Amino acid sequence: MTRLSFGRKFFLTFDYILLSILAFLCLLPLVNVLAISFSSSTAATANIVKFWPVDFNLKSYTYALSKPEFSDAYWVTIKRVLIGTPINVILTMLVAYPLSKDDRLFRWRKYYSWVFIFTMLFNGGLIPWYMTIKTLGLIDTFWALVLPGAVPVFSVILLLNFFRGIPKEIEEAALIDGCTHWRILWRIFLPLSAPAIATITLFALVGHWNSWFDGLILMNKTEHYPLQSYLQTLVISFDLKIMNVKEAELLSQINNRTLKASQIFLAALPIMLTYPFLQKYFMKGIVMGSVKG
Amino acid sequence: MKGLFRRELPFHIMVWPGLLAVLIFSYVPMAGVVIAFQKFIPAKGVFDSQWIGFDNFRFLFQQPDFTQILRNTLVIAIAKIVAGLIASIGFALLLNELGKAFFKRTIQTLVYLPHFLSWIILGGVLIDILSPSEGIVSWALGFLGINSPFFLGSSSWFPFTLVLSDVWKEFGFGAIVYLAALTSIDPTHYEAAVIDGANRWRQTWHVTLPGIAPIVVLMVTLSLGNVLNAGFDQVFILLSPSVMDTGDIIDTWVYRMGLVNAQYGLATAVGLFKSVISSILIITSFVMASKFANYRVF
Amino acid sequence: MTNIFAKNRMITFASLALSISLVFVSACSNGNNSTSGNGGALKASSSADSPSSSPASVEANPFEKYEPAIEITTVRSTSARFKFLDGESLDNNAWTRAYENELGIKVKNVWTTDEAQYQNKMNVTIASGDLPDLMFVSPAQFQQLLESDQIEDLTTAYDQYASPFLRKIMEQDANGLMKKAATVDGKMMGITGFGSIEQGTPVIWLRTDWLEQADLPEPTSFDDILNIAEAFKKNHSGAYGIGLNKDLFGGLATIEGIANAYHAYPKIWLKDDSGKLVYGSVQPEMKQTLATLQDMYKRGLIDKEFGVKDGNKIAEDIMNNKIGLIYANFWHPLWPLQEAMNMNSADGMTWKPYPVLSADDQVASPSTTIPVTGYYVIKKGYKHPEAAIKLANLQLKNAWSDEAQAELYNTDKDQTPFYLYPTISMEPPSKNLEAGIAVTEAYQAKDFSKLNEEQKGYYDNVLAYLDNNDIKSFGNALIFGPGGSEMEVLKKYVEENRMKIGEFYGAPVPTQQMKQATLDKLELETFTKIIVGESPIDEFDSFVEKWHKLGGDEITNEINEWNAAQ
């Protein structure tokens, strides 16, 4: 290690400070949500909670966790993530591998590519989409949450570009050794593009975790809603124009900010926690030459 | 010829499962774009709704405020794309320079958090912190002797506020791709550069940037597909009557149209209009990249 | 990074862009009440024994049980408000059991979805052609289903089976508008979902502790209101004279009541001197209203930042002692005033409702609409169309008649909202007003023997608040008790025949479908700019001109054609 120059030191200090400030600014809203979730409902409605709970209590958490809808929805989402993410990742790898080849090696490559890219650009809208899924008999089934988005085309294109960065020589050597393409994908491309695979896994995970609209439209029973669809029904702003006495009585219960805050936090927690685990794949570089086919 | 096909067969087999999925779930429903040319009424269905040719498109283009809405959409979307790219790449590069792994991981986790809060939540927070009379931003600006503008209520500041808050919310998540790309650079390249006597700036210039260039080009190309997507959720939550002239975008317009009656035909037509523009831009940049840089983006 | 979720975003966008919110239904179901007047609200009573006015063919037992039981499929919107007893659900509760045991009707919910997505899901259901036997549709969907001949004529079923109570609501309450609204070419095509006319009116809510502090008398004119606003702003640091939300109309802290002071009736359709329906927001009286608002803003009586504040932000300001004067609906003591009281009653906070006040010597008329929320319809070809009538009969009997069992069918003491679960849900349009009058009378006589179970609940609240100073009962007490909004304000509106009731309640006319959104934007944008002084008051004249040119004239013609056809 050579001694750091003054300029370098100055730059690093600046860098540390800048990034710390940025991270701090990004943390604040979450701290605010957390503080609200532990506050009394009155304090939250009056919006006097900043970064520390006012009238600390755990009521909203005990209430949220006691609601069967919440745990049901949580379970649907966990199932969806556990089944949907591997489907996304495997299909993405299978499609990206051949499409990363040279046109000389795979002459259909360019046609296939455009077939996929086209789907990123055009869609037929809500009603035809619903009708297709209905015709297949998937309405109100778990598979309606997983199959329609089975191929995340954005991830395919991303992975395809990462695959291209892998030196051709490795693949050629493996072919000469008699490896099949299946084996090359599995034993060489997969380990060599760990950061990229981690990225598309994260995208698939976050995508499944966050999507709510498909649940609301494709599920016929509220028990089948995934978590974000359920949360959507809580977070949506109240229409103050159509209100009768009974509804108004319940408004203060439903419009309860502490309850919303606790559920938002509980819903975001798992996905925030997964990141540090996937992170290690972004952290250390991979030495191309060291992997043997 | 047959030999060629046999050689390529594993490639075909790999593509087919994914191909099947997009054929069923993307291409079949795509036939539904025909309702862009209909006065679509759900009770009549696709086959019995009235055909009206390009009326839906004409209706869109003839809106008295169409040029204003289109300009707002383009300005906000392009500013978001550019600022977002710069922020994400800049952040990834700055983070990459740091040595302490724990610090890096903590920072990276924290900046990715706002992505998981919806605009419905953040909207209320923004109104508070940006309030000229009692917001924290106005307090901070006052400290510097600056009079706080009405960020959310003044037409001239509104687009700026949209872009800045969107970049703040998404840059951490957007940086993931670049961090992955940085990790994929072969460390032997750096070792070689060091042996050649390159300092950090030169290493960044000659190794790091070329190393992530393909991913940057890819992201730029794909983001062109969004020049007409200015971010419905955010704008919808923050829009108010006093900033309509600079804040109203195509998506909020379609939403308001839908409030009066379900305008599926019109919404599909707008979607198709956006798709066509996006396709033209993406295909153009694809062709340019392959012509001038001999680089195939897809 | 905007591009990562290109695909997701498309879906999100599609959803939001296409979600047809229920907001519209209420916003645009203005009304036609050609005889004008009060909608006969006070004549209503929830007794089930008023005489039948129907020239019924063969009258049958309205509660006749099916043997063997029949099944009816339907679809439902659900809500975060739902709360069930242990082991119960939407498919198994007091209502489903009553339907099955008393009527022999098994209700099957084919799908349920959150209320925010109900219209969207209903549209895809209609488009896929897979209609349930019974469904609740918006006025626009009602129109579509009529045109494509997909719904059943209920005339005979209604004539035979409608209970006297149902007939009274459909044909007598609100001047018979509920039946009229569902009748097309002499045929009754559905059962109208209906709110309450008088409850749509604006009410002035005033902090009386601040009023006393300022040593001002109770307001009797709009000038008094301006003085009070001035005093509130001066006396309380950080406070505004009057609350105003960014959408100006509908909800908490609006301008309708202020417009009414100048005899302007924005957002609704009323007859002019020639008998033609015209739009209230473009009448000259509106210009005066805006001039006043502009002046109030200039004098600092209105929050400089109101342009970004929605109802929730207004609620915060009320709780934090920044607003002591608003124009809003009758029910706001329940929210946010209740919360504000929980927080501030120890410091003396009190509120009181007042009727809208006039800026001149003519009495001010509060504006409101005919609240058609939608229609219950039966799919064409369903074998038992009369089942819909029977479901309505039973619901009215169990929930609102003299035989009602509120504990079982409305709300129990744990606030389980059973009233949300009936398959067809109706209520007498003036139920709350009657409750307010009855409860107040009972309180004054200290005799609650004549109250029904629901009213007894309000009576207990009134007693708790007025006699025992129980702040938690403030909300209901200030609506139903003496001095409450029903008694002090709505009753006066109705008895003195003061309401201006919007007379258009049909589905959006063709030009509205295409141009209403543009006109609404123009209106809101212009009004806001005038209020904050960015545009001079004369901008109103060019707005009116533009409004007519950009589609207003066509809409006016179409709405008058609609009116002629009624």
How would you label these PLM feature ranges?
Chain A
Residues 1-293:
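A hydrophobic, multi-pass inner-membrane permease signature
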